[in-house]
Amino acid sequence: MFTGIIEEIGEITAIAESGDGWRLTVRAPKAAADAVHGESIAVSGVCLTVVGSTAETFDADVMKQTLDVAALGAATVGTRVNIEKAMPVGARLGGHIVQGHVDGTGVVLEVRPGAQWSVLRISLPDDLAPLVVDKGSISVDGTSLTVSAVSPSTPSTGSGTQEGSGTQEGSGTLEGSGTRGGHWFEVSLIPETLAATTLGTRVVGDRVNLETDILARHVERLLAFRAAPEGGSR
């Protein structure tokens, strides 16, 4: 389990095909210094298992399913990633409960910089929209954030994904993406988050990993079972 408090920004230094997946080498001196074979490290919100390490790097395997679901599948050598080691028992829970199991991805639709902070608007897949609430918690690229705004429950048009649908203009908005249509949410980033995570360099059109609150996912599942007709397919 993780808490969504990023410990350092790492860099992917090698990608090797391993079966139908990848083996990544990540340079992250703080995490690698005491990395143990078999332990879990979150890489931009994706829980990976350490299979080897040096003083400054660690290796981890990524299965095809993860590459298909997470934004990590588009990573290249040189990609910067958020790093967090698993939370030890008894540690302070500084963010919220993050499992490292990515639910899907969103696209940065808008960046609104302030004097010392920035607001990001991110698209939200339709199936995740009911799980994201104003003032609730969400993990974006492994970073625990508080949702500062959400789209209406019934958006006007469009889908929750805005891939490749426009170009970045000076306003920091994805041109032609129809930010008024489709599901989205906003997060406000304080200076510490901008400096300590990769979110500070995100631009319009970037794809990010999303993990919704585990409590919301459990409630949704329980309600689905309760609503299912007795003896029906579940």
Segments the model singles out, each with a brief description of its role:
Residues 1-155, 161, 173, 179-234:
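Conserved loop->alpha-helix
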